[in-house]
């Protein structure tokens, strides 16, 4: 006998140890391509993309995740957090990190993503002195270069806990 149950499973924040580093493992926070915000995609009357962005559901989920992170951080005030921004490298070339030859330079873009998330966490009550932001560019991908279906995974932020 087989039964099917439909429902929603809430995914919470986990803390994992990677060597000597504590990271908050969170559901994906999704950014627009070549942007450091949660701008919503706009379609014209024909359904064509007028302004690129993420879906309203993705933006709402991003905010839900950040609120939950802030809630946890506000309970554990003896930790500071480094928000690490990451970007998606298209070429894997070092000049992509610092020049606009292939699109926006990845180092400043990833730093802007980290700063954006830091600002959102502050708006949810996390003290500014507990937060720092760094940009890692496209040097630490989670999806391989050229994997167009999963490139969005490289446009991310990670949360490093410091005691």
Regions found by a protein language model. Name each.
Residues 1-82, 92-94, 163:
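Periplasmic peptidoglycan-binding/tethering modules of Gram-negative envelope proteins
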Residues 53-59, 63, 86-163:
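Periplasmic OmpA-like peptidoglycan-binding domain that tethers envelope proteins to the cell wall
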């Amino acid at each position: 006998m087989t039964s099917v149950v439909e429902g929603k499973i809430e995914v919470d924040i986990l803390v994992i140890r990677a060597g000597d580093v504590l990271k908050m493992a969170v559901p994906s926070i999704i950014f627009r391509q070549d942007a450091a915000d949660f701008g919503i995609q706009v379609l014209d009357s024909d359904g064509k993309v007028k302004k690129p962005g993420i879906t309203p559901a993705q933006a709402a989920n991003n905010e839900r995740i950040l609120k939950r992170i802030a809630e946890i951080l506000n309970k554990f005030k003896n930790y500071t957090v480094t928000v690490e921004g990451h970007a998606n490298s298209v070429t894997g070339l070092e000049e992509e990190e610092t020049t606009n030859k292939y699109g926006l330079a990845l180092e400043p873009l990833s730093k802007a993503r980290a700063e954006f998330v830091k600002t959102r966490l502050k708006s949810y009550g996390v003290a500014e002195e507990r937060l720092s932001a760094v940009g890692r560019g496209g040097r630490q991908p989670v999806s391989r270069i050229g994997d167009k279906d999963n490139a969005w995974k490289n446009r991310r932020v990670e949360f490093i806990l410091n005691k």
